[in-house]
């Protein structure tokens, strides 16, 4: 469910960055800032509408995927807290996409890593230390994503003031809105369509009982922390290709794709060396040690899923590059 909604938000924001990158590559900075201004308008509307609809239909969505009665209340609370963080998710992806559009892929990555580490630390404190359960997991996500947005805002104001619109560049522009939506919405739908398969998997898994639901939920949280790197490599490629397309340097696009694939494979080796021996220990961050069966199934899922990370990484890179 979260991947369906967040995937649309992330993909859309990545698409919004493409016209910005193309204008930057063509050295048309006024046009670039006009795209920035109008992309912020769209993002605000998306954040309000998606958050509102997600919260309104949260219960119906959980019934649709056969959520067991034993965990329904906890799942509802967790999802509502996740949905409350949608504006932060959109804000981070929009701002980090704008930073990448100017050729800086490192800083958004550092901010993402910082937010992920903070998320893990807060999970440990709120879930294990304070015993807040799913409420703690939701609060941790909310706070960590909020911090990532603040970091992006701080960086743009300090280091990338060229992105800040001024004067006429702040005007509402129907043509630019249309171009932004034509790039953003299809990329968002790509992720949403992929997520339909995950929802079917979640629905089938829910029918197996609470042990499997708990195992799947815990493993997906850790899995996302690892696989979000693939998404960020792909997003970086979207802006990289946009820049070089705008500058008419088409030969650099192929070089970038090959380099990103090599980077993805190196990262896969790192995840394999970390996940295969330590999956059980990682699951214990989210599952009580006494729930041995849940830990076992969650760790098994993590190890099996890890074998297919190269396929996911390759798909993400090529999809964003195209």
Question: How should these model regions be labeled?
Answer:
Residues 1-52, 89-108, 215-279, 313-322:
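Small-residue-rich hydrophobic transmembrane alpha-helices
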Residues 81, 92, 115, 144-148, ...:
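Transmembrane helical elements of multi-pass membrane transporters/channels
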